[in-house]
Design a protein with these regions (language model features):
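Membrane-interface interhelical connector segments
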Residues: 64-83
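Extended, low-polarity transmembrane helix blocks
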Residues: 2-65, 83-91, 95-182
């Protein structure tokens, strides 16, 4: 056996196994496994950023139009104490959005964020089915869409659960706090 037989890719022959040359795919798998191991601490960053941006954008949109506008929508859908619930929703979306973006207190802010998403699913989105896109018609070349289903809410829930299970990720306040405490 030569040194070339033990090295991956150095001779371009693939990885040598018991029964001869295994494919180049095995070597590629090892390269990707090493890359995955190096990047794993950063895996939560894209989730944090998209969830944080989503919550913050929704909260800012409701707040900029005025809580009374959102309260009117809630009241029309039969939500009790619509004005109070509008403020709770807006506050939760703003605080959770900033917290997710910063990676600060993620397990704590996940609780009200998940409750908010579940309430939205069961009070608003469930009757419209799974899909987030409901094409109603196309008039004069413009698409008309109906109310969204619960697809996006489930995606947010999955991302939040993944963030909580992953724990603090690199470049987050929670990670910084953990390093200070240890």
């Amino acid at each position: 056996m030569t040194a070339c037989d033990d090295a991956i890719f150095k001779c371009g022959t693939g990885v040598r196994g018991r029964e001869g040359t295994v494919s180049i795919l095995a070597g590629t798998a090892l390269v990707f496994e090493n890359l995955r191991a190096k990047l794993a601490p950063y895996a939560g960053i894209p989730l944090r950023l998209i969830v944080g941006y989503g919550f913050l954008a929704h909260g800012l949109a409701k707040w900029s139009r005025g809580p009374e506008v959102f309260a009117g929508i809630l009241q029309a859908t039969g939500v009790p104490m619509a004005y109070v619930m509008a403020w709770i929703t807006i506050g939760t979306e703003l605080v959770a959005g900033v917290a997710f973006l910063a990676g600060a207190f993620v397990p704590l802010v996940s609780i009200p964020a998940l409750i908010l998403l579940l309430v939205a699913i069961f009070t608003v989105h469930l009757p419209y089915g799974f899909s987030s896109i409901k094409l109603l018609s196309v008039n004069e070349g413009r698409a008309q869409f109906g109310p969204p289903g619960y697809e996006c809410d489930l995606l947010y829930i999955a991302c939040i659960v993944a963030l909580v299970l992953m724990g603090p990720t690199r470049w987050s306040v929670d990670s910084y706090r953990r390093r200070l405490m240890s």
